Amino acid sequence: MMVDNQTPDSSTLSTASTPVYAEPQLTEELLERFDSFAQKVARHDGVSAFSEQTRIELSKALRESTLTPPRFFVAEDNGTLAAVFVALTPANDEDTGVIEAAVAPEYRGQGVGSAFFDHAVRQLGDDATRYRLWVHGSATDTGIESPAHAFATLHGFEPVRVLYKMVLPLDAQTREELVERSDARTLPENLRMRTFTGADEFPWLRVNAAAFAHHPEQGKLTLADLRERTGSPWFRPEGFFIASEVEDDSAIAAFTWTKIPTGQEQSELSPSGEIYVVGVNPQAQGGGLGRTLTLRALAYLACAEDENGEPLRAIDLYVDADNTAAYSLYTSLGFGVATVDRMYAPAQQDEPAA
């Protein structure tokens, strides 16, 4: 997220002139520069400013023509990306778009982000009110608000959604307990546990859409979105669990997908794995399938290694703050809130008095 009212590190303070704003045509070279920029911001902030879906949409726009391509704005200073603003365009008249943005660490505290953000929003025109702004790492588990939260409110946005990142550190005892809990769970006799295959693409998309019919992002996944993910270096089919009918593999009752990102830097809680998504067919809800599949995924991650053979040191996941059932489940399993992401919408303007 755009951060501008933060005191910059004097060791990296830029003395450059005012950056030039542009909405350049997306190219492979520009996408590589964006990736480097996003990685630099993430290393500095400890949290990514851009979601996986944003990166996927940019990649798709580069490869294929689309009716609603993302808007991509940059503030550039002599070949250096000082700030980036990405707006994922609404797919239809009822849809909302998503904004994610960031300022390079060395350009913060100089007014670069504020001026650039205002410029990019103006370029969206009358449609700007249809966009929602993501602030990743808006607050910590201690409740301390980030400069990005202050930035969002300063620019006329108010929180409309709260997403918790929850983390479970792994030690020998926790690993053993997760495996034991998973082994103690059984599926109904008409279901079997298996892992994802290519033949599951369309059945999975149908169940995912039904399970997340009211979810602003997950329920909209397309075949192209799915294939972007299953074609990613991090994808492991053995970590994508499906409960389907014994007599019909296409009848999916529930699923849990895990993710072990590649290229993780070593730290106290890294490498880590993620409970990527858990879904239950609405026709199969209420029978504890979500808990059973979640425990199976946790047991898998507890015993998994990264691409370098390093055991995972933590498991993380994301849950909406208003999903009290899921939050209670994860808390009971030992997860704690690490950071808070917030989605913001333009603040409602009061009608002028008659």
Curated annotation (Swiss-Prot):
**Molecular function terms from GO:** mycothiol synthase activity
For the N-acetyltransferase domain, which residue ranges apply? 21-176, 191-354
Q: Which CDD domains match?
A: NAT_SF (cd04301)
Please list the residues that bind 1D-myo-inositol 2-(L-cysteinylamino)-2-deoxy-alpha-D-glucopyranoside. Answer: E52, E217, K259, E274, Y318
Name the chemical reaction catalysed here. Answer: 1D-myo-inositol 2-(L-cysteinylamino)-2-deoxy-alpha-D-glucopyranoside + acetyl-CoA = mycothiol + CoA + H(+)
For region Disordered, the annotated ranges are 1-21
- Where acetyl-CoA 1 is bound, by residue? A101, A102, V103
Keyword Repeat on entry? yes
Among PROSITE patterns, the record links this protein to: GNAT
Q: Which residues form a coiled coil?
A: none
Q: How does it assemble?
A: Monomer.
Q: Please state which protein family the record places this protein in.
A: Belongs to the acetyltransferase family. MshD subfamily.
Q: What is this protein called?
A: Mycothiol acetyltransferase
